[in-house]
Regions:
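Short, solvent-exposed beta-strand/turn patches at coil↔beta or beta↔helix junctions
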Residues: 1-23, 39-45
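Structured segments of extracytoplasmic/periplasmic soluble domains
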Residues: 21-31, 58-65
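Periplasmic OmpA-like peptidoglycan-binding domain that tethers envelope proteins to the cell wall
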Residues: 37-116
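Envelope-exposed proteins and targeting segments
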Residues: 1, 6, 28-30, 71, ...
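Generic alpha-helical secondary structure signal
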Residues: 7, 18-19, 28, 50, ...
């Protein structure tokens, strides 16, 4: 899920992807942490804030689509610290302006068995 330069709004082209993620999380008993990232343009401090706004924007959209709030266990802001592509090119920077999801399966509590 990628973002335009200096933006945190989600493009409508990603709505179906977010709905699919919501369904996957619910059907497979996962909870998630949403992790925001930026390219390297701008100050480190500004980019941490922008990456947080991106993650919060995704959280809000998932909740709007009906995901239970307790499925989202964290928001992380990485700023420009974890690029997946070079920041030396326009294309690379576009790839770095993203949000990722860390999924963890919830533990299921076994039902007690009554002895008769």
């Amino acid at each position: 899920l990628n973002f335009d330069f200096d933006k945190s709004n989600i493009k409508p082209q990603y709505y179906d992807l977010l709905k699919n993620i919501k369904e996957f999380v619910e059907q497979n008993n996962y909870e998630m942490t949403i992790v925001g990232h930026t390219d390297s343009i701008g100050s480190n401090q500004y980019n941490f804030g922008l990456s947080r706004r991106r993650a919060e924007s995704v959280k809000a959209k998932l909740l709007e689509f009906g995901l239970a709030e307790d499925r989202i266990v964290g928001i992380e802001a990485m700023g420009e610290e974890q690029p997946i592509a070079t920041n030396a090119t326009k294309e690379g920077r576009a790839q770095n302006r993203r949000v990722e999801f860390k999924l963890v399966q919830r533990e299921t509590v076994p039902m007690p068995v009554e002895n008769k």
